[in-house]
Amino acid sequence: MVTHSKFPAAGMSRPLDTSLRLKTFSSKSEYQLVVNAVRKLQESGFYWSAVTGGEANLLLSAEPAGTFLIRDSSDQRHFFTLSVETQSGTKNLRIQCEGGSFSLQSDPRSTQPVPRFDCVLKLVHHYMPPPGAPSFSLPPTEPSFEVQEQPPAQALPGGTPKRAYYIYSGGEKIPLVLSRPLSSNVATLQHLCRKTVNGHLDSYEKVTQLPGPIREFLDQYDAPL
């Protein structure tokens, strides 16, 4: 078993401090998975590192529903937490890391497979609505920390199935909507350009046609958000 420390603050490029982290890694591969996730999160601009749940609530409470951030989890069993402002206040969803992938904590009674990803950014992007998708509106409900997927009921323009995810509590539900990350720092022009390019590279062939240095730069952060 390998134990490592809390991650450095967002936007900082120094190596990980390996003295204080309480969460235990199950393997070297899991350690590397998390290190890569932290590196990309630090470049994302919406990783708030060691802010607490209360601090996340204060940050998000003045923002519109759908605003979110990623922070270190205060639960020693998890590395990261997704904090999102909803129509019933701020919700904190634990991001599980197991089996070489990340996933949102889900209802254990659900029979549907939980979407899993090798990167926290890919997980966040999965739960963001595609362009042109409608916003969901439901009455407020009690806080909850579990997510379920509702199968697609109709298709978006272009034939893409529309999937909705809900946070459940006491038999009620509120929509999980991730529409805008809350920035923790000012992004560089290079990073903004990289996100734009990532959002328009819809095939591997397009990537291979780019010059080597540009491909390497894109590989370091391969998400459009």
UniProtKB/Swiss-Prot annotation:
InterPro entries the record matches: SH2, SH2_dom_sf, SOCS3_SH2, SOCS3_SOCS_box, SOCS_box, SOCS_box-like_dom_sf
One example of a Gene Ontology biological process annotation: intracellular signal transduction
GO cellular component: cytoplasmic side of plasma membrane
Keywords assigned by UniProt, alphabetized: Growth regulation, Phosphoprotein, SH2 domain, Signal transduction inhibitor, Ubl conjugation pathway
Region (Disordered): 141-160
Domain of life: Eukaryota
Single GO MF descriptor: protein tyrosine kinase inhibitor activity
Presence of keyword Phosphoprotein: yes
Residue span, SH2 domain: 46-142
Post-translational modification note: Phosphorylated on tyrosine residues after stimulation by the cytokines, IL-2, EPO or IGF1.
Region Extended SH2 subdomain (ESS): start-end pairs: 34-45
Pathway: Protein modification; protein ubiquitination
Region (Kinase inhibitory region (KIR)), start-end ranges: 22-33
SUPFAM superfamilies (UniProt xref): SH2 domain, SOCS box-like
Domain SOCS box: 177-224
Keyword check for Phosphoprotein: yes
Binding partners and assembly: Interacts with multiple activated proteins of the tyrosine kinase signaling pathway including IGF1 receptor, insulin receptor and JAK2. Binding to JAK2 is mediated through the KIR and SH2 domains to a phosphorylated tyrosine residue within the JAK2 JH1 domain. Binds specific activated tyrosine residues of the leptin, EPO, IL12, GSCF and gp130 receptors. Interaction with CSNK1E stabilize SOCS3 protein. Component of the probable ECS(SOCS3) E3 ubiquitin-protein ligase complex which contains CUL5, RNF7/RBX2, Elongin BC complex and SOCS3. Interacts with CUL5, RNF7, ELOB and ELOC.
Function in brief: SOCS family proteins form part of a classical negative feedback system that regulates cytokine signal transduction. SOCS3 is involved in negative regulation of cytokines that signal through the JAK/STAT pathway. Inhibits cytokine signal transduction by binding to tyrosine kinase receptors including IL6ST/gp130, LIF, erythropoietin, insulin, IL12, GCSF and leptin receptors. Binding to JAK2 inhibits its kinase activity and regulates IL6 signaling. Suppresses fetal liver erythropoiesis. Regulates onset and maintenance of allergic responses mediated by T-helper type 2 cells.
Entry note about domains: The ESS and SH2 domains are required for JAK phosphotyrosine binding. Further interaction with the KIR domain is necessary for signal and kinase inhibition.
The protein's name in its UniProt record: Suppressor of cytokine signaling 3
